[in-house]
């Protein structure tokens, strides 16, 4: 069930990946329901996203960046550049063998590994060591 009471049917004739994120859990937690849709859902095509990521990765400044990623936004929220009024989303790449420097989130972060080899993980922790890496971290596979 979509937050505004709609129904969704998904089909594909080839390989497809779907990462569907919405505010329904938040609404359920708050004990509220929607009356009508307020904004339209967003769709980000693989081709467009990949083209943006490739452009960033091939830029000399992008090669030294902590993250090669694209902020996914909804045209309904130009000031916040968010997917919904409460949800941020980014799509990024991390080349094989590279380690992403630790960074902090001010809100919820969901990692979705689309393609990776066994052993790929997210390290979670509350302290950094003298080299700026996570001290006593927890691996989240």
Model segments located where?
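Conserved short histidine dyad/triad with adjacent acidic residue
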Residues: 77, 88-105
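Short histidine-centered beta-strand/loop micro-motifs
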Residues: 11, 81, 99-105, 112
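A short beta-strand-loop-beta hairpin characteristic of the jelly-roll/cupin
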Residues: 1-4, 111-141
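Short, structured patches in soluble enzyme cores that scaffold and shape functional sites
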Residues: 20-23, 93, 114
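Eukaryotic short linear interaction motifs
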Residues: 27-28, 99-101, 119-120
């Amino acid at each position: 069930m979509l937050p505004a009471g709609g129904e969704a049917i998904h089909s594909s004739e080839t390989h497809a990946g779907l990462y569907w994120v919405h505010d329904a859990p938040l609404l359920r937690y708050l004990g509220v329901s929607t009356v009508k849709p307020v904004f339209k859902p967003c769709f980000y095509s693989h081709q467009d996203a990949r083209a943006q990521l490739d452009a960033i990765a091939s830029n000399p400044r992008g090669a030294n960046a902590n993250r090669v990623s694209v902020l996914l936004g909804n045209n309904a929220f130009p000031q916040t550049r968010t997917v919904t009024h409460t949800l941020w989303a980014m799509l990024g790449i991390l080349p094989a063998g590279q380690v992403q420097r630790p960074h902090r989130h001010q809100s919820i972060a969901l990692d979705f590994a689309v393609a990776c080899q066994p052993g790929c993980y997210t390290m979670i922790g509350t302290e950094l060591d003298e080299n700026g890496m996570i001290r006593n971290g927890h691996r989240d596979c």
